[in-house]
From Swiss-Prot:
Residues 61-246 form a coiled coil. Keywords: Coiled coil. This is Coiled-coil domain-containing protein 152. The lineage of its organism: Eukaryota, Metazoa, Chordata, Craniata, Vertebrata. Detected in stomach. The gene is CCDC152. It comes from Homo sapiens (Human). InterPro entries: CCDC152.
Protein backbone atom coordinates (compact mmCIF):
# COMPACT_ATOMS: atom_id res chain seq x y z
CA UNK A 1 0.00 0.00 0.00
CA UNK A 2 2.82 2.24 0.73
CA UNK A 3 4.37 1.59 -2.61
CA UNK A 4 1.16 2.16 -4.43
CA UNK A 5 0.61 5.40 -2.61
CA UNK A 6 4.15 6.41 -3.24
CA UNK A 7 3.74 5.64 -6.89
CA UNK A 8 0.56 7.50 -6.96
CA UNK A 9 2.26 10.47 -5.40
CA UNK A 10 5.02 10.35 -7.96
CA UNK A 11 2.46 10.19 -10.70
CA UNK A 12 0.59 13.11 -9.23
CA UNK A 13 3.78 15.07 -8.82
CA UNK A 14 4.73 14.38 -12.39
CA UNK A 15 1.35 15.48 -13.60
CA UNK A 16 1.42 18.62 -11.45
CA UNK A 17 4.90 19.50 -12.62
CA UNK A 18 3.94 19.23 -16.27
CA UNK A 19 0.91 21.29 -15.62
CA UNK A 20 2.93 23.75 -13.68
CA UNK A 21 5.46 23.98 -16.48
CA UNK A 22 2.69 24.33 -18.95
CA UNK A 23 1.02 26.97 -16.81
CA UNK A 24 4.30 28.78 -16.36
CA UNK A 25 4.81 28.71 -20.10
CA UNK A 26 1.37 30.11 -20.56
CA UNK A 27 2.01 32.71 -17.93
CA UNK A 28 5.35 33.55 -19.48
CA UNK A 29 3.71 33.78 -22.88
CA UNK A 30 1.01 35.99 -21.47
CA UNK A 31 3.63 38.09 -19.75
CA UNK A 32 5.47 38.49 -23.05
CA UNK A 33 2.22 39.37 -24.71
CA UNK A 34 1.39 41.68 -21.85
CA UNK A 35 4.82 43.34 -22.08
CA UNK A 36 4.32 43.72 -25.81
CA UNK A 37 0.91 45.15 -25.23
CA UNK A 38 2.35 47.39 -22.50
CA UNK A 39 5.04 48.61 -24.89
CA UNK A 40 2.39 49.25 -27.51
CA UNK A 41 0.28 50.96 -24.87
CA UNK A 42 3.32 53.03 -23.80
CA UNK A 43 3.91 54.04 -27.40
CA UNK A 44 0.24 54.80 -27.82
CA UNK A 45 0.28 56.68 -24.49
CA UNK A 46 3.28 58.72 -25.65
CA UNK A 47 1.53 59.40 -28.93
CA UNK A 48 -1.62 60.27 -27.00
CA UNK A 49 0.37 62.62 -24.76
CA UNK A 50 1.95 64.27 -27.82
CA UNK A 51 -1.45 64.47 -29.42
CA UNK A 52 -2.85 65.84 -26.16
CA UNK A 53 -0.16 68.53 -26.09
CA UNK A 54 -0.89 69.37 -29.70
CA UNK A 55 -4.59 69.46 -28.94
CA UNK A 56 -3.98 71.61 -25.88
CA UNK A 57 -1.86 73.98 -27.99
CA UNK A 58 -4.60 74.01 -30.60
CA UNK A 59 -7.13 74.59 -27.83
CA UNK A 60 -5.13 77.62 -26.62
CA UNK A 61 -4.81 78.87 -30.20
CA UNK A 62 -8.51 78.26 -30.79
CA UNK A 63 -9.35 80.05 -27.54
CA UNK A 64 -7.20 82.99 -28.64
CA UNK A 65 -8.87 82.94 -32.04
CA UNK A 66 -12.24 82.74 -30.32
CA UNK A 67 -11.30 85.72 -28.12
CA UNK A 68 -10.11 87.61 -31.21
CA UNK A 69 -13.29 86.69 -33.06
CA UNK A 70 -15.29 87.69 -30.00
CA UNK A 71 -13.55 91.07 -29.98
CA UNK A 72 -14.11 91.41 -33.73
CA UNK A 73 -17.78 90.53 -33.28
CA UNK A 74 -18.00 93.01 -30.41
CA UNK A 75 -16.32 95.67 -32.57
CA UNK A 76 -18.67 94.88 -35.45
CA UNK A 77 -21.62 95.11 -33.10
CA UNK A 78 -20.35 98.48 -31.88
CA UNK A 79 -19.79 99.57 -35.49
CA UNK A 80 -23.29 98.50 -36.42
CA UNK A 81 -24.66 100.28 -33.36
CA UNK A 82 -22.58 103.37 -34.23
CA UNK A 83 -23.82 103.26 -37.82
CA UNK A 84 -27.36 102.94 -36.57
CA UNK A 85 -26.76 105.92 -34.30
CA UNK A 86 -25.21 107.78 -37.23
CA UNK A 87 -28.21 106.91 -39.31
CA UNK A 88 -30.42 108.39 -36.62
CA UNK A 89 -28.17 111.42 -36.36
CA UNK A 90 -28.16 111.77 -40.14
CA UNK A 91 -31.91 111.72 -40.15
CA UNK A 92 -31.93 114.34 -37.41
CA UNK A 93 -29.33 116.40 -39.28
CA UNK A 94 -31.37 116.14 -42.44
CA UNK A 95 -34.41 117.41 -40.57
CA UNK A 96 -32.30 120.21 -39.05
CA UNK A 97 -30.88 121.06 -42.49
CA UNK A 98 -34.38 121.32 -43.93
CA UNK A 99 -35.39 123.61 -41.07
CA UNK A 100 -32.26 125.72 -41.60
CA UNK A 101 -33.03 125.97 -45.32
CA UNK A 102 -36.51 127.20 -44.52
CA UNK A 103 -35.13 129.71 -42.03
CA UNK A 104 -32.50 130.78 -44.57
CA UNK A 105 -35.14 131.40 -47.19
CA UNK A 106 -37.15 133.40 -44.67
CA UNK A 107 -34.07 135.42 -43.64
CA UNK A 108 -33.10 135.94 -47.27
CA UNK A 109 -36.50 137.38 -48.06
CA UNK A 110 -36.35 139.51 -44.93
CA UNK A 111 -32.86 140.69 -45.94
CA UNK A 112 -34.10 141.63 -49.42
CA UNK A 113 -36.99 143.54 -47.88
CA UNK A 114 -34.62 145.36 -45.53
CA UNK A 115 -32.28 146.20 -48.42
CA UNK A 116 -35.16 147.62 -50.44
CA UNK A 117 -36.28 149.63 -47.41
CA UNK A 118 -32.74 150.93 -46.82
CA UNK A 119 -32.36 151.88 -50.48
CA UNK A 120 -35.61 153.81 -50.32
CA UNK A 121 -34.54 155.54 -47.09
CA UNK A 122 -31.12 156.34 -48.60
CA UNK A 123 -32.76 157.96 -51.61
CA UNK A 124 -34.95 160.07 -49.35
CA UNK A 125 -31.94 161.05 -47.21
CA UNK A 126 -29.91 161.75 -50.34
CA UNK A 127 -32.54 164.19 -51.54
CA UNK A 128 -32.56 165.80 -48.11
CA UNK A 129 -28.75 166.02 -48.11
CA UNK A 130 -28.78 167.59 -51.57
CA UNK A 131 -31.21 170.23 -50.36
CA UNK A 132 -29.11 170.87 -47.24
CA UNK A 133 -25.92 171.09 -49.33
CA UNK A 134 -27.60 173.51 -51.74
CA UNK A 135 -28.76 175.63 -48.83
CA UNK A 136 -25.32 175.54 -47.20
CA UNK A 137 -23.71 176.50 -50.51
CA UNK A 138 -26.04 179.46 -50.86
CA UNK A 139 -25.34 180.50 -47.27
CA UNK A 140 -21.61 180.18 -47.89
CA UNK A 141 -21.91 182.25 -51.05
CA UNK A 142 -23.69 184.98 -49.11
CA UNK A 143 -21.05 184.82 -46.37
CA UNK A 144 -18.28 184.93 -48.96
CA UNK A 145 -19.85 187.96 -50.61
CA UNK A 146 -20.17 189.69 -47.23
CA UNK A 147 -16.58 188.76 -46.38
CA UNK A 148 -15.47 190.08 -49.76
CA UNK A 149 -17.11 193.41 -49.03
CA UNK A 150 -15.55 193.54 -45.58
CA UNK A 151 -12.22 192.46 -46.98
CA UNK A 152 -12.42 195.06 -49.72
CA UNK A 153 -13.12 197.77 -47.15
CA UNK A 154 -10.26 196.46 -45.00
CA UNK A 155 -7.90 196.49 -48.00
CA UNK A 156 -8.88 200.04 -48.84
CA UNK A 157 -8.32 201.01 -45.22
CA UNK A 158 -4.92 199.30 -45.13
CA UNK A 159 -3.96 200.92 -48.43
CA UNK A 160 -4.87 204.30 -46.99
CA UNK A 161 -2.79 203.54 -43.88
CA UNK A 162 0.15 202.52 -46.07
CA UNK A 163 -0.23 205.67 -48.14
CA UNK A 164 -0.33 207.78 -44.97
CA UNK A 165 2.70 205.97 -43.57
CA UNK A 166 4.59 206.45 -46.84
CA UNK A 167 3.73 210.14 -46.75
CA UNK A 168 4.81 210.29 -43.11
CA UNK A 169 8.01 208.45 -43.99
CA UNK A 170 8.77 210.84 -46.81
CA UNK A 171 7.99 213.78 -44.53
CA UNK A 172 10.25 212.41 -41.81
CA UNK A 173 13.01 211.70 -44.29
CA UNK A 174 12.70 215.24 -45.62
CA UNK A 175 12.62 216.60 -42.08
CA UNK A 176 15.64 214.48 -41.25
CA UNK A 177 17.53 215.79 -44.24
CA UNK A 178 16.62 219.36 -43.31
CA UNK A 179 17.72 218.79 -39.71
CA UNK A 180 20.97 217.24 -40.90
CA UNK A 181 21.58 220.12 -43.27
CA UNK A 182 20.76 222.60 -40.52
CA UNK A 183 23.06 220.88 -38.05
CA UNK A 184 25.75 220.62 -40.67
CA UNK A 185 25.46 224.34 -41.39
CA UNK A 186 25.56 225.16 -37.70
CA UNK A 187 28.50 222.87 -37.25
CA UNK A 188 30.32 224.42 -40.20
CA UNK A 189 29.59 227.96 -38.91
CA UNK A 190 30.78 227.13 -35.41
CA UNK A 191 33.78 225.37 -36.82
CA UNK A 192 34.62 228.41 -38.92
CA UNK A 193 34.28 230.71 -35.92
CA UNK A 194 36.47 228.47 -33.85
CA UNK A 195 39.09 228.24 -36.56
CA UNK A 196 39.33 232.06 -36.78
CA UNK A 197 40.33 232.31 -33.14
CA UNK A 198 43.91 232.41 -32.01
CA UNK A 199 46.07 229.36 -31.79
CA UNK A 200 46.03 229.62 -28.03
CA UNK A 201 42.44 228.52 -28.03
CA UNK A 202 43.00 225.73 -30.59
CA UNK A 203 43.09 222.95 -28.01
CA UNK A 204 39.80 224.08 -26.46
CA UNK A 205 37.97 223.69 -29.81
CA UNK A 206 38.61 219.96 -29.97
CA UNK A 207 36.00 219.21 -27.31
CA UNK A 208 33.05 221.19 -28.85
CA UNK A 209 33.86 219.76 -32.26
CA UNK A 210 33.66 216.17 -30.97
CA UNK A 211 30.48 216.98 -29.04
CA UNK A 212 28.78 218.32 -32.18
CA UNK A 213 29.86 215.26 -34.12
CA UNK A 214 28.47 212.89 -31.48
CA UNK A 215 25.19 214.81 -31.34
CA UNK A 216 24.94 214.73 -35.13
CA UNK A 217 25.69 210.98 -35.18
CA UNK A 218 23.16 210.30 -32.39
CA UNK A 219 20.52 212.34 -34.20
CA UNK A 220 21.15 210.41 -37.43
CA UNK A 221 20.90 207.07 -35.58
CA UNK A 222 17.58 208.02 -33.95
CA UNK A 223 16.13 209.14 -37.25
CA UNK A 224 17.37 205.96 -38.96
CA UNK A 225 15.68 203.86 -36.24
CA UNK A 226 12.39 205.71 -36.70
CA UNK A 227 12.60 205.31 -40.47
CA UNK A 228 13.42 201.56 -40.10
CA UNK A 229 10.40 201.10 -37.78
CA UNK A 230 8.14 202.86 -40.28
CA UNK A 231 9.50 200.77 -43.15
CA UNK A 232 8.95 197.53 -41.20
CA UNK A 233 5.39 198.63 -40.40
CA UNK A 234 4.74 199.41 -44.07
CA UNK A 235 6.27 196.06 -45.14
CA UNK A 236 4.13 194.17 -42.62
CA UNK A 237 0.98 195.93 -43.80
CA UNK A 238 1.86 195.22 -47.43
CA UNK A 239 2.43 191.52 -46.63
CA UNK A 240 -0.90 191.29 -44.82
CA UNK A 241 -2.57 193.02 -47.71
CA UNK A 242 -0.95 190.58 -50.16
CA UNK A 243 -2.01 187.55 -48.07
CA UNK A 244 -5.55 188.91 -47.84
CA UNK A 245 -5.70 189.34 -51.62
CA UNK A 246 -4.42 185.79 -52.19
CA UNK A 247 -6.96 184.25 -49.82
CA UNK A 248 -9.66 186.33 -51.44
CA UNK A 249 -8.70 184.99 -54.87
CA UNK A 250 -8.67 181.42 -53.55
CA UNK A 251 -12.16 181.80 -52.10
CA UNK A 252 -13.40 183.21 -55.38
CA UNK A 253 -11.90 180.25 -57.24
CA UNK A 254 -13.62 177.86 -54.83
Amino acid sequence: MDQSSEGCMKKISSVNLDKLINDFSQIEKKMVETNGKNNILDIQLEKSNCLLKVMQAKEVSIKEECATLHNIIKGLQQTIEYQQNLKGENEQLKISADLIKEKLKSHEQEYKNNIAKLVSEMKIKEEGYKKEISKLYQDMQRKVELNEEKHKELIEKKEMEISELNAKLRSQEKEKQNEIIKLQLEFDAKLARVQTKSKSYQDSTVLPQSIYRRKLQHFQEEKNKEIAILRNTIRDLEQRLSVGKDSHLKRRRF
